[in-house]
Structure formats: structure tokens, C-alpha cells
Design a protein with these regions (language model features):
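Catalytic machinery of carbohydrate-active enzymes
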Residues: 1-343
Length: 343
């Protein structure tokens, strides 16, 4: 974090960080409504927290669940029948944050849960306007607005479980709810049938950020190594941005496929992972999807210990992890042991 940004956050905290007007943890004994802040959440964040909404409704179907999110990630929450209210905010638009917060304020939520590590000034302003009865934060002991704080480090699924425990909500099942689209599910099954795919390996060569993207030379090296080690069929997971590039690479090989649609969505990726025998991925969102679907994995993670603690594969299936220092292209494909590819 640069010095100017840190200074802005410090000033914002000094101005905005006030204790909530009603600071009464006793109301957590029987909460009737919970609000989750997910405006910065990505696909992996949703998957990791997906069980929470289900378990709240199992505990008490009458508890109201609200989610604050953006238009970009709303499609994930809109398909979850356990969520009662979705409130949209325009990212980085402080006026829209104020407008939305004033609207939600009328609901007087019993509990607001915000697990984010870095609290931006617009987020802090939103929290203050909400005027909820209780605020549960993660590592927010130095914030006045949070009257309840989770201090224990762990996987973010554990952070959410801790928030539920502090809300006196018990859970019985922490398995992820992986969403699906029935029409796309049929499309992918047809693709698998048409290409006679059996025990195929799904590979995601692109993560979030330039340090987690394989370059073309390394992609070709990995594909060559995997095909030479085992003659498995391979399916490369693409997005609209990577479709043409990966399709061109795939034509250099036999039995390497890209789903033939330049407008693929996360639901195509989910179904390909659901049907694969093994996932190889540098992208944490697909790692979390594979965890939820109980697929074996080979994953690439940086040596950032805090990031790994929060976002490691939370899987009961076989999972092999390769760590890189600065850039995933440091890793030789030969670090994938041949026996890991026995499927």
C-alpha cells in the first residue's frame, strides 16, 4: 500500500470511525436479520462463503439474509434462493454508496458481517450510515464501529464460520454450494460426448494478476510435458479474453480441446470442472470450485503465507501444491510429478 493511500485511509478512519449508535451485543442472541458486505467479492469469494447462506436458513428459515454487491458479481447471488435481498452498489461511486446505505438503513439489520482485510473510506462510510445493531469484522480491533471482532487467522471459510458462531447460529455442513446453469450443463455434456472425452484433465493457465498468468512458451511446455507423460485428453479452460489464444495453441496438439464458444461464462467452467478427472490451475476461483465439487487438483500458489492461509484449497480430495516466488512462469512443468497425473 503506497503512502498516499495509507494517509487517506488514516484520515478517513479518524473522521468516519465512530461507534455504532446502538451497541448491544445482546441482540445477537436471536438475530432476525444479517447483512453481508460483498461489493469487492470475486467468484472465489462467493464459492468459499456459499455454505453460509444455506446454513443460516437451515438454522432458522425466518432469518432475513441481505447481501451488498455490485452489478458485476450480482449474478452469483441472484441464483442463490437462500438470499432474501440483494442491494447493488456502483463500485468506486461514493454517492451511490451513500444512496444505497440510506435505503438499507431503514431495515435496521441486526448483524452486519464484513470480513474484508482492508476497509476503504467508502466502505467505512457505508457501514456507518447503515446503523446496524451489531458489526462483526475480521482483524478490526482498532476500529470503533465494529463491536465484535474475529481475531483468529485461518481460511476465509473459517472466518465466516466464526462470524456465524458469534451470531449464535450453528451449522452442520460447511460444504460449498457450487452454482449451476441447467442449460449450460447440457451443452457441456454434449461437448464431452461429441469429443469422446473420458477422464480428461482440465487446465487453467490464467489467474488474476500478471504474476499468475502463464506465457505462451510455458503453456506449450506444460502441454507437451503432460501429453508426453500421460496420453490424457486435456481441456483448456478459457474466458472471452483468452479463447482465441488458447484455441490457437490447442490446434498444435492432438487431443487438446477448448470449448468452442468465445463467450464462455463461469458456468461453462464449473461444468467442465465437474466432469474432469483432475484440475490443474493457477487460478484460485477454479481451485475453490474444484474443492466444492471434490475434484483432485494440482495448484500453483505464491509463497505469500498470509494469502495461502486465507485461500488455500479447502479440499478433502488429493491436492498437490506448487509454490512460486515472484511469477508462476518460474516453475518448470517437471515439478509436476508423473504420478500426480495418474487418474
Amino acid at each position: 500500500m503506497n503512502k498516499l493511500k495509507a494517509l487517506r485511509l488514516k484520515i478517513g478512519k479518524w473522521i468516519l470511525d465512530k461507534s455504532s449508535r446502538v451497541n448491544n451485543p445482546q441482540s445477537l442472541e436471536h438475530p432476525k436479520s444479517l447483512l453481508f458486505l460483498r461489493q469487492d467479492g470475486k467468484i472465489g469469494d462467493y464459492i468459499v462463503s456459499s455454505f453460509v447462506f444455506r446454513e443460516i436458513k437451515k438454522f432458522n428459515p425466518l432469518i432475513k439474509i441481505g447481501v451488498i454487491c455490485t452489478k458485476q458479481n450480482a449474478y452469483l447471488f441472484q441464483r442463490n434462493h437462500n438470499i432474501d435481498e440483494i442491494y447493488l452498489v456502483k463500485k468506486r461511486n461514493i454517492l451511490d454508496y451513500i444512496k444505497t446505505a440510506l435505503f438499507i438503513r431503514k431495515e435496521r439489520y441486526d448483524v452486519v458481517i464484513d470480513p474484508t482485510l482492508v476497509l476503504r473510506n467508502r466502505d467505512l462510510l457505508l457501514l456507518r450510515i447503515l446503523n446496524a445493531r451489531n458489526y462483526i469484522g475480521y482483524r478490526k480491533a482498532d476500529y470503533n464501529i465494529f463491536n465484535i471482532n474475529i481475531t483468529k487467522d485461518g481460511h476465509f471459510s473459517e472466518i465466516y464460520k466464526g462470524a456465524l458462531a458469534l451470531s449464535n447460529i450453528s451449522l452442520s455442513d460447511d460444504r460449498y454450494d457450487v452454482p449451476q446453469d441447467d442449460l449450460i450443463k447440457k451443452e457441456i455434456l454434449q461437448f464431452i460426448t461429441d469429443n469422446k472425452l473420458n477422464n480428461f484433465i482440465a487446465i487453467n493457465f490464467y489467474g488474476n494478476g500478471k504474476n499468475r498468468k502463464f506465457d505462451e512458451t510455458h503453456i506449450v511446455d506444460y502441454l507437451t510435458y503432460i501429453r508426453d507423460s500421460h496420453k490424457h485428453q486435456l481441456v483448456l479452460l478459457s474466458t472471452p479474453d483468452t479463447y482465441e489464444h488458447l484455441s490457437r495453441i490447442a490446434t498444435q496438439f492432438n487431443d487438446i480441446f477448448v470449448y468452442p464458444n468465445p463467450h464462455t461464462t463461469i458456468y461453462h467452467t464449473i461444468e467442465l470442472i465437474r466432469n474432469c478427472a483432475l484440475l490443474i490451475s493457477v487460478d484460485t476461483s477454479t481451485v475453490h470450485i474444484a474443492s466444492g465439487l471434490n475434484r483432485p487438483m494440482i495448484c500453483f500458489y505464491s509463497q505469500d503465507k498470509e494469502n495461502f492461509t486465507h485461500w488455500h484449497p479447502n479440499s478433502k480430495n488429493a491436492c498437490h501444491i506448487i509454490h512460486y516466488h515472484d511469477n508462476v512462469n518460474e516453475i518448470s512443468p517437471r515439478e509436476i510429478k508423473p504420478e500426480w497425473l495418474d487418474i
